[in-house]
Amino acid sequence: MSRAPSRSGASTTRSPSLGLEGGDWRRGRARAEWPGSCQSAGAPQPRRSGGGGDKGPLECRDLVLQNALYTGDLAAVQRHFSERAEVDLVIQAESQDLRWTSHKWGLWSLTYQQELTTPLHVTASRGYLDCLRHLLLRGADVDLAPGGQTALHAACTAATADCVRLLLSFGADPEAVSEDGFQPLHFCRSPESVECARLLLSHGAPVNGASEEEEETPLHVAARLGLTAHVRLLLRSGADLEAKNATGQTPLNAACAQPHPAQAAGAYYDVCQQLVEAGARVDSADLDRQRPLHQACKNANARVVALLLARGANVNLMSYSGNTALHNILQVAAYKLEHRPEQVVRELLNHGAVRVWPGALLKVLRHCCASPRTIEALVNSYQRVRVTEEWAEAVPAELVQQHARFFQSLFSLGESPRSLQHLARCALRSALEGRLLQAVPELRLPPALRQFLLLGFEDVLY
């Protein structure tokens, strides 16, 4: 596996008008020195010369040429890069990333990081196929990486599949490692980049190649980002389901652990379903003894939780911190309302989760009162609970007003016993403990009664 040259920043596609001086070609120092000599932009350029032979690429500060590269002006690129022109140039530009820098008198300021790129990187990352082809035909070094990444890394990041195909046809190394330790396949991180991944695999990119520091395979990356098509492709190509990264996560752990908005829950479910159906272990623990179920509950993905439980995940295993899956969902319920955390709580309880100690229910109410249905499912799992005046004081007045019917019924539980219907439900659930979900279909109950037995939501307690 080849190693890219050292750098202090990644290749860039930032506008060339930032951080550049002058309108000529000249040597300069960025984070490394690129010695060489060159005449003005429009004139033929001599090859590198000097007593030591090859001294490295020239730095380009010609704004006219840079503009041609960044805008994909093929005619201008052809005019500048004639047969005698130097092609392997280095462009210094500012990235979009800020960093703190220290100046004299102990003052610190935020400045844009200086980054190095090349004409090949610029055209490949922007999808300028004809310009890229012209540079390659003029002899551009396809694996040059002054900024720590090759043009192939840049093309995969930008999901420019045609450019990836062209670079590979000119001998680009599909196993090239960036300075951060990633191969091009790791940079296929958008839904549009699946064709880039397919091209890399067909040209020999290792499907299980691990990054150097995080030790993540491409399947870890795809699973964490919820890329269903990438996961399908990698699994068909023989990706290792149980490969562990530096924190002990398998791809299934990585998918379950990734925070995501409610609208992305379906994509993460599809990813987890593919992994589980391919044989991923549902109780694989990371270094903190977090299982996929713990992590899915932290992210309140009810469909993933149901999938893992249906595949045999142990509902009561503890993490290194002593938390079960139920603890995890109760800790985030108030902040994940769009994810409908009450569905996760109900799923866990129906699969036999050990309930919260009754003496801690007041604390749970304070923390989860923004999700009344979470409280409903939890309270209905007990035959009776001791409700005191403190319960009414624990809920903000605006929430009581917003969910008046539910909270009034909750607070009234301290004044009267639970209904006979509820007590019968608790008795049946207790008798079927450990096999509730297997037994319910055999009971042939009416749908409404079946839902009641499985803690269906009514927004009222009785």
Q: Would you name each region that the model predicts?
A:
Residues C60, A93, E115, P146-G148, ...:
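Ankyrin repeat start-site detector
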